[in-house]
């Protein structure tokens, strides 16, 4: 799922991307990969690193791109442990912020909703 978010009074979703927006991608599909690699020219190695479920938090650079990998919680209802952590990649250059997570999360939608409620 791909969303284009713009900072106004909170993050506002719009139909198309433009420079200086946040592109949030959860559970990317083939069209998302094509968009990231062909249109935006995001390095393939960044997407491969984010896909590694054992990837540790770190930063990396390639050209004018910066990759920051963090680990965020996701619910695991079929496990004895209620939460596990998964990698999320924050990819930036001079005009874009792109977040890519191969799992559906509650954290980012909650963050977006919070910014809208607070108007920040």
Predicted regions and their residues:
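Peripheral, non-transmembrane regulatory/ligand-interaction domains of membrane transport proteins
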Residues: 1-120
